[in-house]
Amino acid sequence: MTHTHDHEHDHNHEPDYITLVDENGNESLFQILITIDGQEEFGKNYVVLQPTEFEEDEQGLIDVLAYSFTENADGTEGDLQPIPEDAEDEWDMIEEVFNSFMDEQED
């Protein structure tokens, strides 16, 4: 099956990192795998993150996180927001773009 998409996303090969702080104040470092421009369809952008310290499951899979964000007026990235579980169109688009990105990484 061939994946095609018309979403702009960053193919940055230099890893970028972000620190997330949970509700208990614990900091965790994540690598930014991909950013996705969803402005035209959903009015926001998305980022997919992978923990820098991770363990693969028995199938060799790694959990990743996805968040939405809207750029601030000054062009800087705004706060990360959780994507509602029932936002099926958003999740479908993120999954399609992420899978295409991963396919490209394997080539």
Curated annotation (Swiss-Prot):
<dbReference type="Pfam" id="PF06949">
    <property type="entry name" value="DUF1292"/>
</dbReference>
<protein>
    <recommendedName>
        <fullName>UPF0473 protein LL0144</fullName>
    </recommendedName>
</protein>
<dbReference type="InterPro" id="IPR009711">
    <property type="entry name" value="UPF0473"/>
</dbReference>
<comment type="similarity">
    <text>Belongs to the UPF0473 family.</text>
</comment>
